[in-house]
């Protein structure tokens, strides 16, 4: 895979995603209007911090130019925030710090537009871990989002069936799996 092909394919994905959102959101709003409803359309997206870490091209910032976009859902959670990064010459996971930067980049992107922003956190993540790890990192991302007083809308449980019905390891050193522990489900 050449750098030129990577660039061109990323440029194509950017264009197709931008166009698809414009068409789908415009249709949803027009259809809603024909039924007497004011349909709001929000883009669920990771932060530009995360996309740069994962080397993904996104039209995220350009979406502000689309009148059909009412705002964003900032998809920040352990899976994005635990991506190792460099600080003071050392590469390691910094979940709280990275989450804080991710939420900040999302707030900064929308603040000038006046559009609505939802901050998302997820009590688990896509990679198989244990309940103690999920809880520790969930609390780090949850705390990071609360440090943005201008944001008052949250998506706190994006996939409830995955959280409450999923089986995950009881500890890092065990293969035993259980549903969410009582102490953690109460916190949710």
Predicted regions and their residues:
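Active-site neighborhood of glycoside hydrolase catalytic domains
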Residues: 2-41
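Hydrophobic targeting/anchoring helices
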Residues: 41-188
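Short, flexible, mixed-charge acidic loops at enzyme active sites
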Residues: 1-2, 138
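Generic hydrophobic, helix-prone segments enriched in Leu/Val/Ile
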Residues: 1, 9, 184-188
């Amino acid at each position: 895979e050449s750098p030129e092909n990577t660039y061109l394919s990323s440029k194509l994905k950017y264009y197709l995603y931008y166009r698809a959102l414009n068409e789908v959101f415009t249709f949803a709003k027009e259809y809603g209007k024909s039924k007497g409803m004011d349909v709001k359309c929000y883009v669920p997206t990771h932060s530009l911090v995360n996309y740069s870490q994962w080397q993904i091209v996104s039209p995220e910032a350009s979406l502000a130019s689309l009148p059909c976009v009412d705002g964003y859902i900032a998809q920040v959670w352990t899976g994005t925030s635990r991506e190792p990064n460099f600080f003071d010459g050392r590469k390691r996971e910094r979940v709280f710090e990275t989450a804080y930067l991710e939420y900040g980049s999302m707030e900064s992107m929308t603040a000038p537009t006046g559009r609505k922003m939802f901050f998302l956190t997820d009590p688990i993540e896509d990679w198989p871990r244990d309940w103690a790890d999920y809880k520790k990192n969930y609390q780090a991302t949850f705390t990071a989002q609360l440090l943005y007083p201008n944001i008052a809308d949250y998506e706190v449980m994006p996939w409830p069936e995955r959280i409450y019905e999923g089986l995950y390891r009881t500890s890092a050193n065990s293969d035993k799996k259980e549903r969410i522990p009582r102490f953690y489900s109460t916190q949710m």
